[in-house]
Amino acid sequence: MSGHSKWHNIQAKKGKNDAAKGRIFTKIGRELILAARDGGSNPDTNAKLRDVIAKAKAANMPNDTIDRAIKKGAGELEGITYEEIVYEGYAPGGVAVMVKCLTDNRNRSAASVRHKFDKYGGNLGANGCVSYMFQRKGQLVIEKTDEIDEDELMMQALEAGAEDFSAEEEVFEITTDPEDFSAVREELEKNGYTFLEADVTMIPDVMAAVDMETAPKTQKLLDMLEEDDDVQDVYHNAEYPEEFEG
């Protein structure tokens, strides 16, 4: 899959869209609140919070914004209580879609997600209808540069506990067990690497090839889901034609 990796298909457009809409701080803020609520406000003893803080800093989120979100999650500041809900369904072309929401209103989120699936040619299904097609994995993506030695990076990643390493056209992709994600990320950071993407995500086992006629319809639904205020992440297995720009 060189040059046409799962990360390229699944993550590149998502990251671009979030950045263009200026929504990423809001999404990371919710993750910080949830991580601090579930595991406490001390990143030394809360690996999930440590990971989200690293993600926030990589996105250039201001320190005071990070601190406020953590305090809200820990109950030190008044804030909204969020719960995580995952919806599953299909986009045009038989593309499997998982929609992760962090919401303070379950009914609002359910109605909004269902409306978007109905309006843009998808089908919202029952829990479990597509999740079996995905695996929860840690994913680290590093941009290829002349300064990075591929063999050295691979050895460092595998020795740190990574499950898999692949070299694509423009990036290196490192996959970990979710439990090992923090350790691998921190070890590579100590060795001077920076990441285009570093997160625990849902990686599809099989991609669904989408033709040029269907691709705009598929992407439209995915875009509209990502624009929803309650939606945190959209995972899918669409594999677009090389010439499709999105």
From Swiss-Prot:
Assigned GO CC terms: cytosol
Compartments in which it is found: Cytoplasm
InterPro entries: Integrase-like_N (IPR017856), TACO1_YebC-like_2nd/3rd_dom (IPR048300), TACO1_YebC_N (IPR049083), Transcrip_reg_TACO1-like (IPR002876), Transcrip_reg_TACO1-like_dom3 (IPR026564), YebC-like (IPR029072)
GO BP annotations, alphabetical order: regulation of DNA-templated transcription
Cited Pfam families: TACO1_YebC_N, Transcrip_reg
A GO MF term: DNA binding
Superkingdom of origin: Bacteria
Family: Belongs to the TACO1 family.
Annotated HAMAP family: Transcrip_reg_TACO1
Name of the protein this chain belongs to: Probable transcriptional regulatory protein NT01CX_1819
Origin species: Clostridium novyi (strain NT)
